[in-house]
Amino acid sequence: MSFGGITSFYMWVIDDRIAAAAPLCGGVGSVDYFGRKGRMSYHGTYWWVPGMLTKGDQADFAAAIAPKPLMLWAPTEDIGMPKEGVDQFVAKVRPAYQQAGKPSGFVVHQQPGKHSFTMAAFEAMFAFFDKNL
């Protein structure tokens, strides 16, 4: 969730021991988009990985390891993960999961709302882990 969500995303990317991730309001989307259009002071140093964009954006890394299961809970008005950045992420990552033959391994919930944790988010996360672990 939140800071833990982005931490779980980056750990999911780099550590093969992490079989699946489900960041809730975790700041996943596009670092490039957020840097250009978002409120940069919203995220602390934990979010800005030095030099990351010289290698790729969050979607590039997720697409590269498809079909490793990933679920995002991305409220459409979450200041920490603008909808436009999430949309860019989905547009790049979804085809990678389809090409890998496991489109069900990538699940995105873009519910109306702000940065908050709801029972619906937890229920979606539990169902995702039950199915993928």
Where are these regions (language model features)?
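C-terminal catalytic histidine-bearing segment of alpha/beta-hydrolase fold enzymes
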Residues: 44-45, 91-133
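Residue-level signal for short, function-critical loop segments
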Residues: 2, 76, 112
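Short beta-strand/loop motif that positions the catalytic acidic residue
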Residues: 65, 72-74
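Acidic catalytic loop of the alpha/beta-hydrolase fold
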Residues: 76-87, 115-116
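Alpha/beta-hydrolase-fold catalytic nucleophile elbow
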Residues: 24-25, 73, 111
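Active-site signature of alpha/beta-hydrolase-fold catalytic machinery across serine-
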Residues: 10-14
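Gly/Ala-rich beta-loop-alpha elbow adjacent to hydrolase catalytic centers
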Residues: 1-4, 8
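Mobile cap/lid helix-loop segments that gate and shape the active-site cleft of serine hydrolases
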Residues: 18-62, 67, 82, 86-90, ...
